[in-house]
Amino acid sequence: RLVGSEMCIRDRDVERAEKAPAARNDILAKRFGLPMEGYTYYFTYEETLPHRRQDFWQMPCALGGDLSQGDDFCSFVFLFPLRNGNFGVKTRNYISSRTLNKLPAAMRAKYEQFMQEGSLVILEGTVLDMMQVYDDLDAHIVHCGYDVRCFGYDPYNAKEFVERWAAENGPFGIEKVIQGAKTESVPLGELKKLAEDRMLLFDEELMTYAMGNCITMEDTNGNRKLLKKRYEQKIDAVAAMMDAYIAYKHNPEAFE
């Protein structure tokens, strides 16, 4: 049985939990002893609006690669540290022609928009050939004049790509980013603050789309990680941006 004052506290907590979804998991865990993992859309609509178009010709950058959906979607982000703490952001993504052909009509129209802006490349075949991806990305880097100083990658499905990168560009500044709340929580928090302050200068619709889809999962210690289960709602470019950001943070001397 609950005594009166305890009842009031409990009611107040229930009311708070209903009104503030973000606080809900905290309250359920602390007040009612129910461990909850919270799912939240991470970026607000305003934070995902693209900036005016700009080029980062011959500028130093960190590259992030998320190759984990090798048969389906492969994502790279170039992150350019700018003056006053801003970051330029450009993305290049790959899918196979089979993946494109299997898309529902509405989704296909969206992907065609990405193809037109140059953020999405279709490679012939059933699954992506990582060496073909490498060749295209390499040509893209040369064409855009990007000066890649470090490379962060999610190790899943990345072995031959990373080995070739090290062979051709040297082993320096290559960072393996293990997925999970322990690694992801701090960089995600910092990217969120940068997005809030409109300091991530992206101008591509694909980046807007990935950020809008981005759901994070919070464990009971308040650590966050990206939720990647949603097959059709692509967030790979956000994962690649995080990989690039971690590589940048771990290699400050490369940008001096």
Question: Locations of the language-model features?
Answer:
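Nucleic-acid-processing active sites and adjacent nucleic-acid-binding tracks
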Residues: 80-147
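Short, small-residue-biased leader/transition segments that mark boundaries at the very start
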Residues: 2-9
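An acidic- and aromatic-residue-enriched active-site/binding cleft used to recognize and process polar
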Residues: 66-70, 81, 94, 153-158, ...
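Conserved helicase/translocase motor-coupling segment
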Residues: 16, 21-77
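Short, surface-exposed connector motifs at secondary-structure boundaries
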Residues: 141-150, 169-174
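Short glycine-rich phosphate-binding loop at a beta-alpha junction
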Residues: 145-157, 162
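Metal-dependent DNA phosphodiester-chemistry modules and their immediately adjacent helices/loops
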Residues: 1, 164, 168-255
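Acidic, metal-ligating active-site segments
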Residues: 71-84, 235-244
